[in-house]
């Protein structure tokens, strides 16, 4: 068996990254914002610590 050189298509990988990373970031930040909004709705003033 001969060794087959690994072909790396960097442009394809680059475009795949930029098509998936923003989608994952959008979902993550949307869920985080929704969680904080609901947390503040059910437990008001828990994010504010008066001294």
Curated annotation (Swiss-Prot):
<keyword id="KW-0602">Photosynthesis</keyword>
<keyword id="KW-0603">Photosystem I</keyword>
<dbReference type="GO" id="GO:0009522">
    <property type="term" value="C:photosystem I"/>
</dbReference>
<keyword id="KW-0812">Transmembrane</keyword>
<dbReference type="InterPro" id="IPR002615">
    <property type="entry name" value="PSI_PsaJ"/>
</dbReference>
<dbReference type="GO" id="GO:0031676">
    <property type="term" value="C:plasma membrane-derived thylakoid membrane"/>
</dbReference>
<dbReference type="GO" id="GO:0015979">
    <property type="term" value="P:photosynthesis"/>
</dbReference>
<keyword id="KW-0793">Thylakoid</keyword>
<dbReference type="InterPro" id="IPR036062">
    <property type="entry name" value="PSI_PsaJ_sf"/>
</dbReference>
<comment type="function">
    <text>May help in the organization of the PsaE and PsaF subunits.</text>
</comment>
<dbReference type="Pfam" id="PF01701">
    <property type="entry name" value="PSI_PsaJ"/>
</dbReference>
<keyword id="KW-0472">Membrane</keyword>
<keyword id="KW-1133">Transmembrane helix</keyword>
<comment type="similarity">
    <text>Belongs to the PsaJ family.</text>
</comment>
<protein>
    <recommendedName>
        <fullName>Photosystem I reaction center subunit IX</fullName>
    </recommendedName>
</protein>
<feature type="transmembrane region" description="Helical">
    <location>
        <begin position="17"/>
        <end position="37"/>
    </location>
</feature>
């Amino acid at each position: 068996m001969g060794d087959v050189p690994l072909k790396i298509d960097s442009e394809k990988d680059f475009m795949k990254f930029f098509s998936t990373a923003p989608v994952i970031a959008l979902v993550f930040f949307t869920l985080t914002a929704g969680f904080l909004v609901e947390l503040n709705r059910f437990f008001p003033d828990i994010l504010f610590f008066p001294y």
